[in-house]
Amino acid sequence: KTVCTVGKIDDIFAHRGITRSNHTHDNASSCDAALKFLKDDFEGLLFVNLIEFDMIYGHRNDPRGYGDALEAFDRKLPELEAQLRTTDLVIIAADHGVDPTTPGTDHTREHIPLLAFGPRINCKINLGIRETYSDVAATIAENFHLPPPSFGSSFLSSLVPDSPSISP
């Protein structure tokens, strides 16, 4: 399978295990790059980092900018959704919490957002508070018929109850 990355993901993984990358530096160009990869109709993983939420707004204590960036991303989601194939799974999460309204610039929250959607996804469920962030990795592994990681529990069956996996 192909592994495409957008943003600083290539640096985070030392350019290992990546088939194609587009190293972007802001949310808008990251969204545009993601849309371009989706239009290429590849089979595999598209891993996108939206750097501004963390670097520009979260760690810089800018709640208004953070809110504006969220609204801009929300406006891009319909475009992304329109490019999805019937078997695609989108997972939106953060790697940590940074509350831009609190004093200091360190990570502030244990819990992060976790949203999943796609054409075959049961979007009317609450995944609850997951035991570990590794659940995302376990879900991706199951989706691609890979061995489960040592940690984490897949929530794929909650998203697509009638199918053990959604990717061919």
Where are the language model's segments positioned?
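Feature captures the catalytic ectodomains and active-site-proximal regions of enzymes
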Residues: 1-168
